């Protein structure tokens, strides 16, 4: 029992609504404690409706805008949402929309990954392609390759941790320095955005290195998978 919210999705904004249903069913059929539960779904001629629990605490983006989280809290929340992401990958899916807005905090103070609207199934080679991208969080391979792998999600999760550790102002101040879209794209491709050498003073160097591994511009130099990401985070001490 409890409050629920209804998410209303325009079918016209989904390239293939049948494919959307099939991938959603594959994900929702196997629940995970760190994924937002879907209570039920239905549709009419124009919309898809999805019912899910109401999260009164809101998203990690909301929480970090109101207070500073400790290193321990950020690592704990990160391991939790990454556990949900690992489950998604194990089902042959890529999320494609990892960001602080899409990590909700439950009443039990646990992180749940949400919003599977861009999630796509991988082909037999482990590739998939998103229908859209979030312009503030873009992996460099977007500009050089049509085939995306789970490393797309690993980069996005690294960028998410970078934002959680340094704060939204630190992140957005870097964004405002670009004079053109070409400057922004070039900074992503060359690894100059976000600034991997610019962390708040209290962030442990070991944690900085782990996050920067996820943010490597070369996918083969990122974490091989989410479990490797989680294992490294679990070894970080606060001081």
Regions found by a protein language model. Give the residues of each.
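AlphaC helix of the eukaryotic protein kinase fold
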Residues: 14-29
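ATP-binding glycine-rich loop module of kinase domains
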Residues: 1-15
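Activation segment signature within eukaryotic-like protein kinase domains
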Residues: 77-78
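Catalytic-loop of the protein kinase fold
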Residues: 89-105
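AlphaC helix of the protein kinase catalytic domain
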Residues: 60-69
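Conserved short submotifs of the Hanks-type protein kinase catalytic core
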Residues: 45-59
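A short, aromatic-enriched beta-strand patch in the conserved N-lobe beta-sheet
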Residues: 40-41
């Amino acid at each position: 029992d409890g409050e629920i919210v209804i998410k209303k999705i325009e079918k016209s904004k989904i390239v293939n609504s049948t494919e959307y249903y099939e991938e959603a069913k594959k994900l929702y059929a196997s629940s995970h404690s760190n994924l937002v539960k879907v209570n039920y779904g239905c549709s009419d001629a124009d919309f898809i409706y999805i019912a899910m629990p109401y999260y009164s605490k809101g998203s990690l983006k909301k929480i970090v805008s109101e207070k500073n989280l400790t290193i321990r809290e950020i690592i704990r929340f990160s391991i939790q949402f990454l556990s949900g992401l690992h489950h998604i990958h194990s089902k042959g899916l890529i999320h494609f929309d990892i960001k602080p807005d899409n990590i909700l905090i439950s009443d039990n103070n646990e992180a749940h990954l949400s919003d599977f609207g861009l999630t796509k199934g991988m082909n037999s080679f482990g590739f998939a392609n998103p229908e859209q991208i979030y312009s503030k969080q873009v992996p460099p391979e977007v500009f050089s390759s049509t085939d995306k792998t789970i490393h797309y999600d690993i980069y996005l999760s690294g960028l998410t941790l970078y934002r959680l550790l340094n704060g939204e102002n630190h992140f957005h101040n870097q964004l405002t320095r670009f004079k053109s879209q070409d400057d922004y794209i070039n900074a992503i491709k060359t690894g100059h955005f976000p600034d991997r050498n610019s962390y708040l003073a209290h962030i442990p160097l070991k944690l900085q290195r782990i996050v920067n591994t996820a943010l490597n511009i070369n996918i083969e130099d990122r974490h091989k998978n989410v479990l490797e990401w989680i294992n490294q985070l679990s070894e970080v001490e606060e001081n």
